[in-house]
Amino acid sequence: MTLRSVQSRSKRKPIDVFDYSDEDDRVEEESKKLLRKFDSPVTKKHHCAIDKYEFLRCFAKDTQSESKVLQHIVIDVEVPVKEEPSRCELSGDGNSDLIDVISNGSHRRIGIDSLTSSSLSENDEVSTGEATNPASDPHEVDPENAQVLIIPDVIIYGDIYCTNSKLTFSRNCMNVESSSVNATKGTFSCQWTIEDIIKIESQWCLEVETAFVNVLLKSRKPEGVDIAKDISGIDLLKFSVYDPKWSKEVETIRSLDSRYKNIWFDTITESEEIAFSGHDLGTSLTNLADSFEDLVYPQGEPDAVVVRKQDIELLKPRRFINDTIIDFYIKYLKNRISPKERGRFHFFNCFFFRKLANLDKGTPSTCGGREAYQRVQKWTKNVDLFEKDYIFIPINCSFHWSLVIICHPGELVPSHVENPQRVPCILHLDSIKGSHKGGLINIFPSYLREEWKARHENTTNDSSRAPNMQSISLELPQQENSFDCGLFLLHYLDLFVAQAPAKFNPSLISRSANFLTRNWFPAKEASLKRRNILELLYNLHKGHDPSILPANSKSEPPHCGVSNRNDQETESENVIECCNWIKPFDGSSSTVTDISQTKTCSPDLILSKEVSYSGGYDPPSSKLRKVFMSPIVEEVQESCEKKDHLEMDIQKSTGHEIETLRKEGCMLYIEDSDDEEAVSVEYVSDSQDSYEVEMKVEDDDDDELIVTGESSGIHGSREIKSDSASIERVNKSRDSTAASCYNDFLLVLSDDERSSDDKENILISSNVMAKPKT
């Protein structure tokens, strides 16, 4: 037995080396934990650089503790950061990005290749914008040891825009790195200390769960960057980022340093304050939506657009207008063009490009060719595109609108001709240049080639010329916020149709004429289109369609003053019709809208001026530039004879005429409801920020009516001893920088002693008169 036991042990010795010991089991478990971190990204997504760092740390015995899975990007700093001057670099080399990292009191530069940047933005589940300490709550940040990384959708800084970027907030500075600059592979790297940051304005758009941020910085001009300064000494950096948890991330950034709390504001942009100051657009929309029923426009057409209540809601500030509003305005614009000129243009609706590029299937097709043509061939069955001068195509992709214009598609230009007058080309008009990459535009040449083949299959004409059409991305006015792209599309379209030449050559565009240049129009002018479209929908909803031309009329439709100047009676009737249905948008009615006996309409009608240029914004070039939205307001100015000097006649003054004051010294007339005699009210301009009017009554010189206010609003106070009249409402629209009554206020008087039925009549007859002081 002993012998057998010895033999057994001797046989087992050769295989003892294959048995697992406790130490081997421990190593195996550690290996499994490490390998889990390198699983397929489909299962778990981690930043490769961080995983390699943890892997090397473990095998270098740098730590004995179990490595925790990181959910956020954290950069540890061993010592307090030393603040150094801001620095920016713009490079045309697309091989790598440069990040300035401050450590141990000196700068170090870490190179990050484009693959790493891409993986950060596309493959990571890391919450872009949250900074954490591994041992603490995600939003309880130790500002000494953490930075906040944000992956913006787009960054705009002066004349450059970056689409593949990283933005980092730390306790002492803000860094920007990008590997895609102005749609090229150039790189951009910039750093600002927190002292360089003047203000941060953050806006949140719930509909698309995207934040839009303006960072105001102390001015400096990095090499290769042209900064347009609205205010001397201040630069503007803008970025947008999709992040459903943005509010928490803002708090995380604020927790880095108390100085962020002092400079970070949740606010609206300056352009919106200018565009909507003094007007309660929300009230207007609420009142309109309450009574709004589905609007079919144009009535009776098979492809009419149906505007619903939910579409009206999108006209509120800081919201994106949808395809319904775009298509509606395109239809309106098309109907405004005279039949003779209409044949030069062709307008596609918003669904055309979506169908052409096959956006409903996910990733857009940029090389459609025959397949793209077959998807939309029915759209042009009865239209020959090659007979048109201009073809307009609205584009929506990645929550952004832009416009494509195909010019002279049927024109064949011989190669030996220099500077031909008519050049076939494709124009791309984008209010955030670079947001829609060139690939989206490249689908049009191949589509036009297939369209040409289908139209000329029995001819020998050259069918290869369409793909060779030159594609041009224009330098145009850019939007000043991140939600007016649809309005810019419509304004581009509006102005182009109004100014489109019969013969177009992009190489002959004159910079001095501003056509299709950055100086084409003020950016704020496009933002004001939101209110103009609301006004148009209001009028159409009330049954006043300015685009309907009477069957027996050879002139333009009677929208606010468009008339034959030789026919005074027709002119008066047209103006009456317009002035009766234009209404203010302050949520209340106005005596102006109820005046049925109006016989004149001054060049600067108070109501028209108020609706057209809200907040005192009156672009100097707007009166000279004709657009297809403007006739509602501007053509009333042309229809009436302008008078620089009006005769003052108290005896002939009635409560039905309202004329804007054009001089610093003004005389107002108030008609008392108990007395037909007009009472004079003298305007006194003490300063640019305060306004007073004094009411002079013959019976008692001490009685006065005082209206005072600042640029933010005008408020009325009653100090008249007589009980014959009282102020019921003050409706203001005044430029805060003007020293005259150019945009006048309107006082509506009523008698408290009258019955409610009589008060209606009083509101019609008792109103403020305004004439220049003699």
Curated annotation (Swiss-Prot):
Disordered: annotated span: 118-141, 548-568
Presence of the UniProt keyword Glycosyltransferase in the record: no
GO molecular function annotations of the record: SUMO-specific endopeptidase activity
Entry keyword annotation includes 4Fe-4S: no
InterPro entries in the cross-refs: Papain-like_cys_pep_sf, Peptidase_C48_C
Keywords, comma-separated and alphabetical: Hydrolase, Protease, Thiol protease, Ubl conjugation pathway
EC number(s) per entry: 3.4.22.-
UniProt enzyme class: hydrolase
Active-site residues annotated for this sequence: H400, D430, C485
Domain of life: Eukaryota
Alphabetical list of Pfam families matching this protein: Peptidase_C48, PH_ULP
One of the protein's GO biological processes: protein desumoylation
Family: Belongs to the peptidase C48 family.
Main function: Protease that catalyzes two essential functions in the SUMO pathway: processing of full-length SUMOs to their mature forms and deconjugation of SUMO from targeted proteins.
Official protein name in the record: Probable ubiquitin-like-specific protease 2A
Annotated source species: Arabidopsis thaliana (Mouse-ear cress)
Primary gene name: ULP2A
